[in-house]
Amino acid sequence: MVKSIRAPAGEDERKDWLVRFDDSGRKISGVGTPPFEAPIYTQIFKARPDVQAIAHAHAPMCIVLSLADRTVAAVHMQSIPFEQSVPFYARPIHIKDDAEGADLARILGQGRAVIIKAHGLVTAGKSIDEACMTALYLEGDR
């Protein structure tokens, strides 16, 4: 798996800041350390062979929706992937271990998105573009 990280202060932000890690969260190569929430990625990839990319963001509007116990409504063409409601992961925690990651993957099911209560969103796709655009549409579909 590959995850981008923020460029350290004073470093060139145009440079690729990527860390590559295995399915147990151990660093293989790259810059920095694997994210402590690596189980988000490892457990979804394990549960969903069709998924090739995952996006995780601390999206403010999704956080607000989760705190209000409101789901996303399909109100425009870009919200078609959310025609069926986006599930919530009800525990407002960081996903730090395999059991939590597997529980998140179970709640995601065959869907393209899940909102972690008071935390953010996770989207899954067949490409980086699909996972990222799904996240952008989800955050913009208030």
Regions found by a protein language model. Give the residues of each.
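Glycine-rich flexible loops
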Residues: M1-R142
